[in-house]
Amino acid sequence: VSECLVGSEMCIRDRAINTYELVKPGDKIAVCISGGKDSMLMAKLFQELKHHNKFDFDVKFLVMDPGYNEANRHVIEENCRNLGIPATIFESDIFDAVYDIEKSPCYLCARMRRGHLYAFAKELGCNKIALGHHYDDVIETILMGMLYGAQVQTMMPKLHSTNFEGMELIRPLYLVREDDIKAWRDYNGLHFIQCACKFTDTCTTCNNEENRSKRVEIKQLIANLKKVNPFVEANIFKSVENVNLATVVAYKKDGIKHSFLDHYDE
């Protein structure tokens, strides 16, 4: 596994972590493993990072079982063993809690999972949780916000928790492409779960492309745009780094909306 990790490990260490100052001396980071390819690679990269890094920090590898069926739980445990990841598994009943909710169960599930991860990580003395979102997640989120939410925003590389004082969320794979993660998975002949909730209990073998979600639609839109403009992904990513407030009609800061008219005649 380590042979195919070298290139990606340099990416996580020298790009996202340094660019956005994600890891600092003395940090104790809870690396959150969902069981998918992204979080598993992130866990391996943190092992490499800790081994080669110039300053000291600590990591804990966490797997939250929100109610996986036996097959999915087994896949996660086997992958952790095969990859040499000393993961701590803790239980929750999130799947049961959201199972009967008709409106936006996935959104609620994600929020609850993050809250449980923050809480358990804090109990372990961690000051940060690391999630496995990657570059493609970021650009898809930008477009989803524009096309379906009427807003310009991005998935941040790090942010302070609003509910757990002293805790931060970091995304070390922020600059890693999904195709590179898939290449690592395929090179090593690995198999991971995808979404494994009670709504999609067959997801040890399912294909995410069958899920006609908004994110899949956006992914397909980007792929089509890339056929015409090979730079479209980078341009979407950079667009939220180049916002000129002098050329927007309005913007929000700290929940307050500001209009260009506020200072138009000054």
List where the protein language model places each region.
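Residues that recognize and position ribonucleotide moieties
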Residues: 3, 110, 174
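Short, basic, helix/turn surface patches
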Residues: 111-124, 158-164, 218-239
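The feature marks non-catalytic terminal segments
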Residues: 190-266
